[in-house]
Amino acid sequence: PKTTDVLEHTTFLRYENNKVSDIISVETKDFVKADVKVSYCVDFDTKYMDKWFSVDNYVKYLCDRVRSLMKREAKKYTIEEFYQNYSDIVRNVAIDYQDTASETESGHIGRFFPENGMFIKDCEVLSIRVESDIAEILDEHQKDMVEKSLELTNAESRVKVAEALFE
């Protein structure tokens, strides 16, 4: 996760294609903790150039805001629901998918921060790590579901063959 322990001070701001990585720690509604590793692609809107430096540390600001939103969102799901859909859930929160069906007031698609003209134009969800004992249960459940799905497909195929032979 990002911290302010070691900062690099510079007078240079790259305004396009900034890569910011973070690890977001969340807790689901059934009190299971998970860590999600993400990578954001961030741009700064040139129309907001006068606000680019209004936030002292844009990386910290970005990570803190998205972490807060993500912690609130994760509380809506059980660990099973979250684990199965974490990539979409995290990405939709990070880029503000519900509001990006149309362009934002800045003219860009993505989560926009008017405080400093920054916007997240993409979010890559890299991995999830769940408490080991819970991860084992989830993996076993997933394995059982795949086995049952294959058994069902096999049974349906046999029924179709039997029906075809009967006709």
Please annotate each region the language model reported:
Residues 4, 8-167:
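Elongated, amphipathic alpha-helices that form coiled-coils and helical stalk/scaffold elements used
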